[in-house]
A protein has these predicted regions:
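Short, flexible loop/turn elements at secondary-structure junctions
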Residues: 1-3, 75, 184, 200
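A generic secondary-structure signal for well-formed alpha-helical elements
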Residues: 56, 63, 91-94, 135, ...
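Short helix-capping/linker segments at secondary-structure and domain boundaries
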Residues: 91-97, 132-139, 240-248, 278
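N-terminal Rossmann-like or analogous alpha/beta NTP/dinucleotide-binding catalytic cores
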Residues: 3-128, 278, 282
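Internal, conserved structured core segments that host functional sites
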Residues: 100-104, 109-158, 181
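Conserved nucleotide- and phosphate/pyrophosphate-binding catalytic cores
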Residues: 11, 146, 152-319
Length: 319
């Protein structure tokens, strides 16, 4: 996960909820991808360190357990970059140029100069991030599938060129997660300025919820609503008690409750729902020494594995 901004509810109920489940079943490595943040934010990286520690606080507050998973910062394990260099020597340029994510982001992020090797080649760094721990499964969304396939191709090519099965071919691990849209109905994203952040105060949450888009076909309170297509209702299903959700659904369909009242109810439940997370955030914010120890422990664990993999790869190459 790249530290390019604060984490929001979409992150909490998407990647973090999934990672929390996975750490109970697998040996997991979770790292803050601060080098990857530089692919798009290289002109001003002053915020990367701040967001890195904010991200780690949110991860721990969301339930990632340093006793069950290895949690660390990418740039503190320099073996990633050395393996990336080895991979960059064998990766054909057309493999990178046909990457659909590369093409899409070039179109979307028009305000940034992305004509750099770092941006074109970041999937090679991703491959190093994955293969240096000899990962067999990688939790990803559908949009990341091309990157996993490229990682497999790089591993296959490396093994073929140096006639040794150094790296496994990882498989994607897809998971269904609740789709929480931003307050404007688009994908929740810091880039769209439509996110509800895990660090938002109750006052800010109330203000953002009051701005949320609702059922466009419901123009008046007396009009029957359609909860199944209302963004507010999708949040209710996560943060409001089930019996209340059922009542809201019925009242909305029968025009017994208006959108303003519905949003006020959601805001109160959402504030209470993320309160435990925010209390844990406050704990780590005020116990910086403990946070640092957790991360340093994860860095040492990761580096032991990464160093062994790198040495094996270098031996296969003959350097």
């Amino acid at each position: 996960m790249r530290p390019t901004g604060k984490l929001h509810l979409g992150n909490l109920h998407g990647a973090l909820a999934n990672w929390k489940r996975l750490q109970e079943q697998y040996e997991c490595y979770f790292f803050v991808a601060d080098w990857h943040a530089l692919t798009s934010d290289y002109q001003d990286a002053s915020h990367v360190q701040e967001y890195t520690w904010e991200m780690l606080i949110d991860w721990l507050s969301a339930g990632l357990d340093p006793e069950k998973a290895t949690i660390f910062i990418q740039s503190k394990v320099p073996e990633h970059t050395e393996l990336h260099l080895l991979f960059s020597m064998i990766t054909p340029l057309p493999w990178l140029e046909r990457n659909p994510t590369y093409k899409e982001q070039r179109k979307e992020l028009i305000e940034k100069d992305l004509n750099t090797y770092g941006f074109l080649g970041y999937p090679v760094l991703q491959a190093a991030d994955i293969l240096i721990y000899k990962a067999h499964l990688v939790p990803v969304g559908v949009d990341q599938l091309p990157h996993i396939e490229l990682t497999r191709e790089i591993a296959r090519r490396f093994n073929y060129l140096y006639k040794k099965e150094v790296f496994p071919l990882p498989e994607p691990l897809l998971a269904e997660v609740p789709k929480l849209l931003g307050i404007d109905g688009r994908k929740m994203s810091k880039s769209y300025h439509n996110a509800i952040y895990l660090s938002d105060s109750p006052e800010v949450i109330k203000e953002k919820v009051s701005q949320m888009f609702t059922d466009k076909s419901r123009l008046r309170k007396s009009d029957p609503g359609h909860p199944d297509i209302c963004n507010v209702f999708s949040f209710h299903k996560i943060y409001t008690p089930a019996e209340t959700v059922a009542q809201i659904e019925e009242d909305c369909k029968n025009a017994k409750i208006g959108c303003v009242e519905c949003k006020k109810c959601l805001a109160e439940n959402l504030i209470q729902g993320i309160l435990p997370h925010q209390e844990r955030r406050h704990y780590y914010e005020t116990h910086a020494g403990e946070l640092k120890e957790i991360v340093e422990f994860g860095i040492k664990k990761a580096q032991m594995v990464a160093r062994a993999s790198l040495e094996e790869a270098k031996a296969a190459v003959g350097i």
